[in-house]
Each structure stands twice: as C-alpha cells, then as structure tokens.
From Swiss-Prot:
The lineage of its organism: Bacteria, Pseudomonadati, Pseudomonadota, Gammaproteobacteria, Vibrionales. The keyword Thylakoid does not apply. Pathway: Protein modification; protein lipoylation via endogenous pathway; protein N(6)-(lipoyl)lysine from octanoyl-[acyl-carrier-protein]: step 2/2. It comes from Vibrio parahaemolyticus serotype O3:K6 (strain RIMD 2210633). Its cofactor is [4Fe-4S] cluster. [4Fe-4S] cluster 1 binds at residues 68, 73, 79, 308. This is Lipoyl synthase. The gene is lipA.
Length: 321
C-alpha cells in the first residue's frame, strides 16, 4: 500500500501529484487515445503581446492572482490583450482537487489581510469598468472565504464607484447560511456559481461537491437579493448527454438563474479527465435556443465560452461565442 502524500503548507500540487490525492479513483490508469482537436478549436494568438505582459506585471507587482493563468484558460491571450482579467482571491491553492481543473491543490496559506485594498488599487490603475472576482475553494476557513469576498467588494467600490462587480463563488460547503449572511451587505452586481456538469458526473468530475447544494446556494442568494441576477456555467465534453444538459438548464431556471454559460471542456494535461468529445458549434447554437426558450435572459454558448469570458458583454446580453 503506497504511503499518502504529506502536503506541505503553501506548496502547489499539480497534475499527477494532484490527481494522486483524489480519494475516488475514477480515471483509467492508462490514458486512452487523446482526441484530436477539430478546426473550430484552433486559437489565433494576438500579434502584439505587450498588453498581456503589462497585465501580468501588474499582477506580480501587487502579488495578485488571475484564474486565467492559474487555471490555464485558453482565452488568456485574447482577454489579456483586451485589458481584461478575472482576479482570483484567497490565494492560488485550492482545498479541492477536481480532476478537470488546473488550479493547484494543497494546504493554503492564511488569507492576506491587505488583498482587498491591493485588488481595489490594481483595478483602479487598470481603469476597469467591469470586473470578475473568483476564488479557490477554502474549506479550511470557517466562513469559506465569504468575509474576504465582502471585503473585496467593499474596497473595490470605494475606489471605483462606477464599477460593476461579478463574483464567481465556490459552494461554501457546510457553511452556506453563514457565507450568505456575511456577504449580504456587500453583494455583487452579478452572482455566479458554476454547476460545471450534469449530476451523474459529479462523483467523477467534482469530488466533494453536491449538485443540489449548489442549486440551493443560487436559490438562497436570489431570495435575499431579488434584484441581482444569478448566473451559472457548464462544461461540455465530459461524457454528458444533450438531454442531461437540458435537464440541468431546467433545474437552473427553477432556482431563479437567468444567466448561462456553456463551453467546451479542454483537458489541461494528460493527468486530467480526458475530453470525451468535441461539441460542434451548431450544438451550442441549439442549446442556446433551448436556454432562451426556457427563460434565460442571457445565454453565452460556444466552444471557447468560459464563465468570465467577455463577462461585461455577457451582462449586456451581447452575442458571445
């Protein structure tokens, strides 16, 4: 019997080391043949990378993190080149170890008390009008990091009074009511929590998460803040069926969610869950029509759509693919 890995505090565990820590072994020991990316999944990189380097430099200077980098988002070059980024608070080490995600797992350090102020100053320096704030899961904190979210929202608005804030929150497992109570006085302009996939695949893709719990989080926030739109996102290509996705859309609408993102899952490495299929753009178009028929007011559906991809345009209801 192999000896369990002893995690050191503040150390990032990635790829094979991260996957070895997942208690439920649901991936094959030998990776099956990797699917070739179709033409519609090819990305054209921008010719000028100066804007990208400027944003990375601003992040490093203020010791901030972006989920764009930490999760190896395929849209990083495009978004950074347009001067947009999704900030990731509460460190860059997650207490969960989802096998689809490239964010590092481990024992995180305590939250940095000055992070809300640094974040607000950086956003002001970048002259952003719309910002997305997300975080790693922090199951080690009594409030799951909710107070830190509230502090960030407050500090950002003090320095940037005209800004719109979207928060992409974790599930606050076991502490939902505490978290919602802490955030009630400083709510975002858009509240986002991703279901990620169909409930049948949760044991495989989201160990430690609960489908019904996530739906309840979205519902309870909406009940507390009826004027704040709620949003959720799903990946496709993990083995779900189209019918399962439609059932999830119905569940989201039944829990008050009006904004939706659907995108293609891409495996960050051979150690992560493999892509089961590449969903053609036409199928994303069909699902967008279904979403609008179900009553979603905003539905961004396409191979490269991610939760925060052109989030400002998503909030305006503009076409995103």
């Amino acid at each position: 019997m192999s000896k369990p890995i002893q995690m050191e505090k503040g150390v990032k565990y990635r790829d094979a080391d991260k996957m070895a820590l997942i208690p439920v072994k649901n991936m094959p020991t030998e990776q099956k043949e990797v699917l070739r990316k179709p033409d519609w999944m090819k990305i054209k990189l921008p010719a000028d990378s100066q804007r990208i380097q400027d944003i990375k430099a601003a992040m490093r200077k203020n010791k901030l993190h972006s989920v764009c980098e930490e999760a190896s988002c395929p849209n990083l070059a495009e978004c950074f080149n347009h001067g947009t980024a999704t900030f990731m608070i509460l460190g860059a080490i997650c207490t969960r170890r989802c096998p689809f995600c490239d964010v590092a797992h481990g024992r995180p350090l305590p939250p940095e008390a000055e992070e809300p102020q640094k974040l607000a100053r950086t956003i002001a320096d970048m002259k952003l009008k719309y910002v997305v704030i997300t975080s790693v899961d922090r199951d080690d904190l009594r409030d799951g990091g909710a107070q830190h979210f509230a502090d960030c929202n407050r500090e950002i608005r003090e320095l940037n009074p005209d800004i719109k804030i979207e928060t992409l929150v974790p599930d606050f497992r076991g502490r939902m009511d505490v978290a919602l109570d802490l955030m009630k006085d400083n709510p975002p302009d858009v509240f986002n929590h991703n279901l990620e996939t169909a409930p049948r695949l949760y044991r495989k893709a989201r160990p430690g998460a609960n489908y019904k719990w996530s739906l309840e989080l979205l519902k309870k926030f909406k009940e507390q803040h009826p004027d704040v739109p709620t949003k959720s996102g799903l990946m496709m290509g993990l083995g779900e069926t189209k019918e399962e996705i439609i059932e999830v859309l119905k569940d989201l609408r039944a829990h008050g969610v009006t904004m939706l993102t659907l995108g293609q899952y891409l495996a960050p490495s051979r150690h992560h869950l493999p892509v089961e299929r590449y969903v053609p753009p036409s199928e994303f178009d069909e699902l967008k029509e279904v979403a609008l028929e179900l009553g979603f007011t905003h539905a961004a559906c396409g191979p490269f759509v991610r939760s925060s991809y052109h989030a400002d345009m998503q909030a305006q209801g503009l076409e995103i693919k």
